[in-house]
C-alpha cells in the first residue's frame, strides 16, 4: 500500500473521544474535501474522498455527532481519476450541518478559512483539524531528498489557517501556490514524523522512518563507494607516475647512484601497487615507510640534478598526460 493510502487508512481508525476534537476533525474534513451546492433551493453538503474507510468514518461522525443522515456514492475510476472516489452527501439537513460545522457563518455566508471554533480552540482541536485535512486532501511522499507531507487546500485562507494550526502544535509548515493551487507543505523529515505521530498515524510513522533510515544508509554507502573509487584512481595515478620517474632516474644515473638508493628504486618498480609501508617491509633489511620514501625521493633528486647538469629531460618529463588517465 502506498504511503498516503496507508496513512489515511490508519487515521480512519483513530479513536477520538472528545466531542470538540470530533467536531474539529469533521469541520476540516468537510472544508478541505467538501463543497456547498444549491439543489432545488436547498443547501447540499458534499465531500469527495479517495478512501472508502475515510468516507465511512465521515458518514458515521455526521450521524453520531450531529444526528443527520448522509449518503455515500461511489465514482468509479476513469479518465483523470486514477482510483475510485467516494462522495458523502447530506441533502435533507445540509444547511443545518453547514452552519454547525462552520462551512457557513451566522449570516449564511460561506467561510473561506477554517471556522472560528477550530481556529481559536485548544491544541487538541488543532491536531484533529490536521487529521481531518490530511484524510481529506493529504499526501505523503517516500522519504528522500524531496520528501514532503502536503495538503491541497481549497483556497489561501484555509491554507493560512492550517499553517496557523501547525504552528500551535509545534510543527513548521509553509503555504505556497503551485500552478494556481494552494498547498500547505511540511518538508523536514523530523517534522513530518512528529506531525504523523500527533495526528495518530503511529504505524505509518514507523514504516516511514524505516524507509527513511534505509535510504540514508544506502546514500551513505554510495558516497563511501564513490570516495573509495576516487581514492583508488588517485593511488593508481600516483603509482604510474612514481614508476615512470624512477625508471627515468635509473636511466639518467646508470651505475653512478648509491646502491641503497637504486635498490629502493628497483623495489618500487617491482611492486608498483604496494603502499610505502608494504614497500618498506619488502626491503632487506626492512625499512619504515618514511625511510623507503626518503630513499626514493633522494634518488629522484639526484637524477634531476644530473639531468640539469647535462641539459637532458629530468624525471618529471617521463610523466606524460596519458599516464594520468585512469
Swiss-Prot record:
GO terms for molecular function: DNA binding. The keyword Transport does not apply. GO terms for biological process: cell division; regulation of sporulation. Residues 275-308 bind DNA. HAMAP family: HTH_type_WhiA. Involved in cell division and chromosome segregation. Belongs to the WhiA family. PANTHER family: CELL DIVISION PROTEIN WHIA-RELATED. NCBIfam families: DNA_bind_WhiA (TIGR00647). This is Probable cell division protein WhiA. It comes from Salinispora arenicola (strain CNS-205). InterPro entries: Homing_endonucl, Sporu_reg_WhiA_N_dom, Sporulation_regulator_WhiA, Sporulation_regulator_WhiA_C, WhiA_LAGLIDADG_dom. Keywords: Cell cycle, Cell division, DNA-binding.
Amino acid at each position: 500500500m502506498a504511503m498516503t493510502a496507508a496513512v489515511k487508512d490508519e487515521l480512519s481508525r483513530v479513536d477520538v473521544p472528545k466531542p470538540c476534537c470530533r467536531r474539529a476533525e469533521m469541520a476540516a474534513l468537510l472544508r478541505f474535501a467538501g463543497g456547498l451546492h444549491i439543489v432545488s433551493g436547498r443547501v447540499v453538503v458534499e465531500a469527495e474522498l479517495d478512501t472508502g474507510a475515510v468516507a465511512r468514518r465521515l458518514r458515521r461522525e455526521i450521524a453520531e455527532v450531529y444526528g443527520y443522515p448522509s449518503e455515500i456514492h461511489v465514482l468509479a475510476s476513469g479518465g483523470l481519476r486514477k482510483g475510485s472516489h467516494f462522495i458523502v452527501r447530506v441533502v435533507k439537513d445540509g444547511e443545518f450541518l453547514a452552519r454547525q460545522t462552520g462551512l457557513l457563518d451566522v449570516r449564511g455566508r460561506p467561510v473561506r478559512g477554517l471556522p472560528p471554533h477550530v481556529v481559536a480552540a485548544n491544541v487538541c482541536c488543532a491536531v484533529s483539524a490536521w487529521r481531518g485535512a490530511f484524510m481529506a486532501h493529504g499526501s505523503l511522499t517516500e522519504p528522500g531528498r524531496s520528501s514532503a507531507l502536503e495538503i491541497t487546500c481549497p483556497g489561501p485562507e484555509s491554507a493560512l489557517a492550517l499553517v496557523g494550526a501547525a504552528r500551535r502544535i509545534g510543527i513548521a509548515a509553509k503555504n505556497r501556490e503551485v500552478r494556481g493551487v494552494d498547498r500547505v507543505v511540511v518538508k523536514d523529515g523530523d517534522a513530518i514524523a512528529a506531525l504523523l505521530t500527533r495526528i495518530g498515524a503511529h504505524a505509518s510513522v514507523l514504516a516511514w522512518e524505516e524507509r527513511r533510515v534505509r535510504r540514508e544508509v544506502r546514500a551513505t554507502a554510495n558516497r563511501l563507494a564513490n570516495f573509495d573509487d576516487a581514492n583508488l584512481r588517485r593511488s593508481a595515478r600516483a603509482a604510474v607516475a612514481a614508476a615512470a620517474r624512477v625508471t627515468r632516474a635509473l636511466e639518467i644515473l646508470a651505475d653512478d647512484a648509491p646502491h641503497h638508493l637504486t635498490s629502493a628504486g628497483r623495489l618500487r618498480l617491482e611492486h608498483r601497487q604496494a603502499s610505502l609501508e608494504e614497500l618498506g617491509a619488502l626491503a632487506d633489511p626492512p625499512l619504515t615507510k618514511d625511510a623507503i620514501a626518503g630513499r626514493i625521493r633522494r634518488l629522484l633528486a639526484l637524477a634531476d640534478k644530473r639531468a640539469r647538469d647535462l641539459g637532458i629531460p629530468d624525471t618529471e618529463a617521463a610523466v606524460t598526460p596519458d599516464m594520468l588517465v585512469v
